Amino acid sequence: MFKHETVLLHETVDMLEVKPDGIYVDATLGGAGHSEYLLNKLNEKGHLFAFDQDQTAIDNAKIKLADYSDKVTFIKANFRDMKEALNERGIEAVDGILYDLGVSSPQLDERERGFSYHQDAALDMRMDQEQELTAKTVVNEWSYQDLIRIFFQYGEEKFSKQIAREIERRREVKPIETTGELVDIIKTAIPAPARRKGGHPGKRTFQAIRIAVNDELGAVEDSLEKALTLLKPGGRISVITFHSLEDRITKQLFQEATKGPDLPPGLPVIPDEYKPDFKLATRKPIVPSEEELEQNNRARSAKLRVIEKIIK
């Protein structure tokens, strides 16, 4: 069964200031926790469009949200294609959009998906099972330099060179097929003192490969840029991030959007066209409460940022 602890459930949806008759988007359906809470706030005129590129997530959400079937439309697509998918359905603007950028726990926990460094499985890591690029391709075919780049940039891994070198050495003997083999390579490459602290030694490398396979950071940037253009005045976007790379992208995009164009010097009054279109609804990111952290350890690194389109 598709189980997923929803992080910052109330905060994320409540910060959207949901209108009962509004049109909303859940860009990351996952376990449908946020969607369910949001649908509860809509009347018969309100509607939710829920996106996921994982068919399993959609199939399970259809069962979970069966009572709301007339108020929700499920769309199997990467959220970077959200604007086009909504436009195709006649939707040009929406009242709110939410993102939960954590990988759904079921995807991490399903052995055959190849995300987990705790269980041996084929190297896969695709969110969209119809996509061609897999973790096996990255590990066996990407150059030494590209592996260093993704391990360092996406995993913030100190031992990127050592791990890439060991991968290169092993794959010359035979292809690297499984997550277990990759974990063994990582453990060989990382010096013993470093292996003993900071959680599982494979954590950063696996994160880096997953981000690369799914082009996660590129998709986040594309999607958020389009999301800003979809908002009605007064509408809001809530974004939960789980690591510094996504948070940096979100923070920079939001700051850029709230700046407004450069002003000519010496203006006594700022004309409307020079006023920014957006304002931050959260000066500092909202983080989970101690109570939530006790119940769900995966929420530890979560940060929620919210932006609002200004009514002019």
From Swiss-Prot:
UniProt superkingdom: Bacteria
Keywords, sorted A to Z: Cytoplasm, Methyltransferase, rRNA processing, S-adenosyl-L-methionine, Transferase
Family membership noted in the UniProt record: Belongs to the methyltransferase superfamily. RsmH family.
Species for this entry: Listeria monocytogenes serotype 4a (strain HCC23)
Binding sites annotated in the UniProt record for S-adenosyl-L-methionine: A32, G33, H34, D52, F79, D100, Q107
Protein name: Ribosomal RNA small subunit methyltransferase H
GO cellular component, one term: cytoplasm
Gene Ontology molecular function terms on file: rRNA (cytosine-N4-)-methyltransferase activity
Catalysed reactions, semicolon-separated: cytidine(1402) in 16S rRNA + S-adenosyl-L-methionine = N(4)-methylcytidine(1402) in 16S rRNA + S-adenosyl-L-homocysteine + H(+)
Function: Specifically methylates the N4 position of cytidine in position 1402 (C1402) of 16S rRNA.
Gene Ontology biological process terms, A to Z: rRNA base methylation
Primary location: cytoplasm
EC number(s) recorded for this UniProt protein: 2.1.1.199
Location relative to the cell: Cytoplasm
